[in-house]
From Swiss-Prot:
Belongs to the KdpC family. GO terms for molecular function: ATP binding; P-type potassium transmembrane transporter activity. InterPro entries: KdpC (IPR003820). It comes from the Bacteria. This is Potassium-transporting ATPase KdpC subunit. It is found in: Cell inner membrane. Disulfide bonds: none annotated.
Length: 185
């Protein structure tokens, strides 16, 4: 029996060492050398070097002077990320969407873009379609006393055109550009 047990335990120990320590350390080392920004969470820093967030995770921007992200089912917390799992026929979902639509419609004119009313699958999508952000321009322009045309140009500069899929804008990057614009002013 020892003849069978010893090789099995040796292999289990070896594979534990390789797959549990050596391989993860090797991949981490390669990632740190080849892709240091992505390996460390795609952190976004301000001019003073302070971390402002991650380019991969949405944030809850408050106040009329900022572009707002789409709603989050998990309160923008990475631990609670995920969809609300409420069906389209669920009254709680209908009430939340109606409340959000009423709030947004009071501040603007015209129909509210769907992206401002619906959560993403992860609840943390940092991107919005340009139309959803263009809808917010009058509110942000009024709060910051900036010309609408300047914010439209800023939005155009921040719009990403991926190879596959529609154009998107990273809301954190757009708000950082907005912050820099206020400093320059």
């Amino acid at each position: 029996m020892t003849a069978y047990l010893r090789p099995a335990l040796s292999l289990a120990l070896l594979m534990t060492l390789v797959t549990g320590a050596l391989y993860p350390l090797a991949v981490t080392g390669i990632a740190q050398v080849a892709f240091p920004n992505q390996a460390n969470g795609s952190l976004v820093r301000d001019a003073q070097g302070q971390v402002r967030g991650s380019a991969l995770i949405a944030q809850d921007f408050q106040g009329d002077g900022w572009f707002h992200s789409r709603p989050s089912a998990g309160a923008y917390a990475t631990v609670a990320s995920g969809a609300s799992n409420l069906s389209p026929s669920n009254p709680a979902l209908a009430e939340r969407v109606k409340g959000d639509a009423a709030t947004l419609y009071q501040a603007q004119q015209g129909p509210v873009p769907q992206a401002l009313l619906t959560t993403s699958g992860s609840g943390l999508d940092p991107h919005l379609p340009p139309e959803a952000l263009a809808y917010q321009i009058p509110r942000v322009a009024a709060a910051r006393q900036l010309p609408v045309e300047r914010l439209q140009a800023l939005l155009e500069q921040a719009t990403l055109h991926p190879l596959i899929g529609p154009p998107v804008v990273n809301v954190l990057a757009l708000n950082q550009a907005l912050e820099k614009l206020a400093i320059v002013r």
